């Protein structure tokens, strides 16, 4: 699975002795377009909402798209994720909808006895149970890992990450920092976006 991620933003915490970068609670809203051209068609939106309390991280993601395959045939896809993550576990509920037909997915990934075990239920099917490779990162931990490596000036690196939304399994991503000049500029019709203070990196994954 490969996709272009044009921008990765991280708030940076600075200690008196050294710079330490880590993920911070945040909300991000995206416009999804088909392709990188300046006139690429808009096909949907995505909202990423990450909060934290004493119980751990809470990640919500809401993705909605509509793609016109022909003049008379459109495909609408939606994915709504709600999840909780601690150092040792990731629990989530996911509703995926295609052309108005919903499918529920519930899952848990947890460290047990030195192993990382997944237990996932797709709709009414029996639970899928399997063991993930030891280096697998949970979603919020994966963001932290990317920030740490980029802040350490790593230009390119791999990472194993559990993906609850597309495949419900682990996949390998290759992260490469890009030249900032490669970022597509904002369109005149787009509303202005002001980034919060902090470090940012354009990357390809």
Can you describe what each PLM-predicted range is?
Residues 6-16:
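Bacterial N-terminal signal peptides
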Residues 61-115:
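Hydrophobic/aromatic-rich structural module bridging two neighboring secondary-structure elements via a short loop
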Residues 93-205:
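Mature, soluble, non-transmembrane domains
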Residues 28-33, 49-51, 62-63, 75-78, ...:
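A generic short-segment signal for beta-strand/edge and adjacent turn/coil regions
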Residues 19-74:
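N-terminal cleavable signal peptides for secretion/export
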Residues 24-28, 42-44, 55-59, 77-79, ...:
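Residues at beta-strand starts and edge strands
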Residues 1-3:
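N-terminal secretory signal peptides that target proteins for export/translocation
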Residues 15-25, 51-53, 87, 184-205:
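Short, surface-exposed loop and linker segments with low hydrophobicity and enrichment for Pro/Ser/Thr
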